[in-house]
Amino acid sequence: MGGTRPEATLHNRLAVLRVERNLSRQQLADALDVNYQTVGYLERGEYNPSLDLALRAAEFFALPVEAIWSRAPFPPMSVQLYEATP
């Protein structure tokens, strides 16, 4: 009974990481070797990255893939920061 499973949306922190580093969409697109519109689609969750693109983003930001992409929504950064401080 092999059917095709609908593709799940991946949640990401791409926009947060881009803004933290003061990068435009075009600058990030150039670094990842994609069109700037692709960056917008990724940030809005309208497009899931290929494995290669996800790995390139992780390498560019020097973060593990799971820090950028997740199947579950990320909690707000403020929640994570305050939970981490004693």
Per-range role (PLM):
Residues 52-67:
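DNA major-groove recognition helix of helix-turn-helix/homeodomain DNA-binding modules
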Residues 1-20:
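A short, Lys/Arg-rich alpha-helix, primarily the initiator
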Residues 19, 30, 59:
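Alpha-helical residues within the helix-turn-helix
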Residues 22-41:
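Short alpha-helical DNA-recognition segment
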Residues 25, 36, 46-47, 65:
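The DNA-contacting recognition helix of HTH DNA-binding domains
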Residues 2, 59, 69-86:
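Short, charged recognition helix plus adjacent turn
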Residues 19, 33, 44, 73:
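Residue-level detection of the helix-turn-helix DNA-binding "recognition helix"
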